C-alpha cells in the first residue's frame, strides 16, 4: 500500500470563537492530489514547529484574512493595513525555516505567498488603492 505524503497546513485563528480553523477546500485539494493534510495550530515555538515538520513531506501555506506585520519587512503600518495576527506570521516564518532546513517543498497561496516573500527578504504594498498610482 502506497503511503500518502503528509502536507502540513497552518490553521487560521478565529478570535471570536477562539478556535483554530481551516477552509475545507485546502484539505480536500491536498487529499484529491494524493496527499494527507495535517492541520498545524498556531503555536509559534521553534521546538514545536521543528517536531511537527519532522513528520511532513511538504508544507502548504494557506490564505488568511490578515496581513503580514509590516515591521517584519522594515515598514511602519499604513492606515489601510488589515488585521495582523502575530502568531500566524511567526508560525509561517518558523515553518518556512524548518521546511527549508529539511528541503521540503512549499506551496504558498495568497497570504502564504506574502509570508514567503517576506521570509525571503521581500516587501509588500500594504494598501494598493492609496500606495500605487495609476
List the predicted regions and their residue ranges.
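Conserved G/P- and acidic residue-centered "switch" motifs that form tight phosphate/ATP-binding loops
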Residues: 110
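The feature captures the ABC ATPase H-loop/switch
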Residues: 113
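N-terminal beta1-alpha1 cap of cysteine-dependent amidohydrolase-like domains
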Residues: 1-107, 118-125, 129-134
